[in-house]
A protein has these predicted regions:
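Helical mechanochemical/support elements of P-loop NTPase systems and associated helical scaffolds
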Residues: 228, 232, 332, 336, ...
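Extended, charged/polar low-complexity intrinsically disordered regions
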Residues: 32-239
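Conserved NTP-handling cores and scaffolds of large molecular machines
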Residues: 240, 266, 290, 344-348, ...
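Phosphate-sensing "switch" segment of ASCE/P-loop ATPases
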Residues: 355-362, 367-450
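Conserved ASCE/P-loop NTPase catalytic core
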Residues: 243-374, 379-383, 397
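N-terminal acidic, proline/glycine-rich, low-complexity intrinsically disordered segments
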Residues: 1-31
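Conserved phosphate/pyrophosphate-binding and hydrolysis machinery centered on Walker-type P-loop NTPases
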Residues: 222, 226, 248-252, 417-420, ...
């Protein structure tokens, strides 16, 4: 167990003494059993006879992998992001013993049931904190530096409180707190001081991340050397929930191609195909660094830059902006598509008197409701796009990749893996780290283009 896991394990142990903590409520019988999903841990796959891939994963990435069937069993009743759920499963269920796994799943359910903050229960939790004087919560924490006071302040997403003083040790140790925030287990204390009414009565006693607080990309590269190319492809596909043994080589590469916008800056990708092929799943569920714009209705202010508030839009906040159902893309602003074309070409856009830059990739996914042969005879492969986009060659020329979605099979139960893969958060973070490395000249060794 590396230092990160030791800190987390120690953090969970420290919560045992806190009133309202995780350990305290373990005696309540109804927490785990009531309304919980029944699940058998005697899988048809014999995990005790570990494959070479699983053995290597346990050797080089222990604590960063999870059995994907466990995620499916809990996700149905847990209103938390997949990457948070898998991180907890990776800590409690990193074993091949069915009894240990069953106990670990019960622990994860208990932790979520007792400490996860639902937005509609925020005031109830705050009242409980005031009555008890201390309480433990699971929430997404973002830290900002208050320059005027020269102090760090935390903001709780679901709890709805901000400007909570936090020790500078935490943002120094877990830098992702400063970069969009991470999910944490936090011990809170409440003490109202009459003499200092301006001070916050809420204080952070201890904070323990339940996402990867940071990723060592060199450690990943060293571990990668132990795998063959085909083995690594299998690991990557299982990490996004797919079973490679049910896929043809071409289908594997097409599924991997969906990850390109998450790895490359300013990469424009389009995928059109039949329904039920999981076109938008990767951008919505797997990566916390991408956002799926459903319905297609948006504005220039929301997507690029709000001149009234002087704030950057989605392209400045996310690594990847995906549009679901391209047929419904509609800008309220007349110049919206032109600004989008400028951004897709150069990674920058002009608003007001200045030019702004961003690195978010653009993804367009949609459905084709007829056969490709008929589509080619009657219109084009970009027919699902609105006319002002699908017939504009300047817009189409800015696409770096077109994934033929009709070559990807419709997903059935056998296509989803029950085997080991990377925790979604770990996968997303090392993919994000790879965005900092440039491989644009990698082809020059083998090809000359143009």
């Amino acid at each position: 167990m590396d230092n990160i896991e030791k800190d987390i394990a120690q953090g969970y142990a420290d919560f045992a003494d806190d009133e309202g903590s995780i350990e305290e409520v373990e005696t309540e019988e109804n927490v785990v059993t009531e309304n919980s999903t029944s699940f058998s841990f005697e899988e048809t796959t014999n995990f005790s006879e570990m494959s070479d891939i699983n053995r290597k994963l346990r050797a080089y990435f222990d604590g960063k992998i999870v059995r994907k069937d466990l995620t499916k069993s809990i996700k149905e009743g847990a209103n938390v992001p997949v990457y948070v759920l898998e991180f907890l499963l990776g800590q409690y269920c990193s074993s091949d013993d069915p009894s240990i796994i069953e106990e670990g799943v019960a622990n994860v359910k208990r932790i979520l049931a007792d400490n996860y903050v639902r937005p509609d229960e925020a005031q109830k939790i705050l009242s409980l904190l005031r009555q008890r004087g201390s309480h433990t919560v699971i929430d997404k924490i973002t830290v900002n530096l208050n320059i005027k006071k020269d102090t760090y302040e935390a903001e709780f997403s679901n709890l709805g409180i901000k400007a909570i003083p936090i020790s500078e040790d935490y943002p120094s140790k877990f830098d992702r707190l400063l970069c969009g925030g991470i999910w944490c287990i936090v011990q809170l204390e409440y003490e109202y001081i009459e003499e200092d009414k301006n001070a916050s009565p809420i204080h952070i006693r201890k904070l323990t991340p339940i996402q990867m607080p940071h990723v060592d990309i060199n450690e990943l590269k060293q571990g990668r050397k132990a795998f063959t190319k085909d083995e690594w492809i299998s690991v990557m596909l299982r990490s996004i929930g797919m079973e490679p043994d049910t896929l043809k080589p071409r289908e594997k590469w097409l599924l991997l191609a969906r990850m390109l916008p998450l790895v490359e800056n300013n990469f424009n990708l389009c995928e059109l195909g039949p329904r039920s092929t999981g076109k938008s799943h990767l951008y919505k569920e797997i990566s916390p660094n991408s956002i799926l714009v459903s319905g297609g209705q948006t504005t220039v202010a929301n997507l690029f830059y709000n001149m009234a508030r002087k704030t950057v839009g989605l392209v400045g906040l996310w690594d990847c902006v995906a549009f679901d159902e391209v047929a419904g893309i509609n800008f309220k602003d007349k110049d919206g598509i032109q600004i989008m074309k400028d951004y897709m070409a150069s990674g920058s856009f002009a608003r007001g008197k200045e030019e702004k830059s961003a690195s978010a990739s653009m993804v367009f996914v949609g459905n084709i409701n007829q056969s490709v042969d008929v589509l080619l005879k009657t219109s084009s492969l970009f027919a699902p796009f609105p006319p002002e986009m699908g017939t504009d060659t300047a817009f189409l020329d800015r696409m770096h990749c077109y994934i033929p979605g009709w070559e990807i099979p419709k997903f059935r139960p056998q296509h989803f893996t029950n085997d080991y893969g990377f925790i979604s958060d770990y996968l997303a973070e090392f993919i994000r780290e790879l965005r900092k490395e440039q491989y644009g000249d990698a082809l020059d060794k083998y090809f000359r283009l143009g």
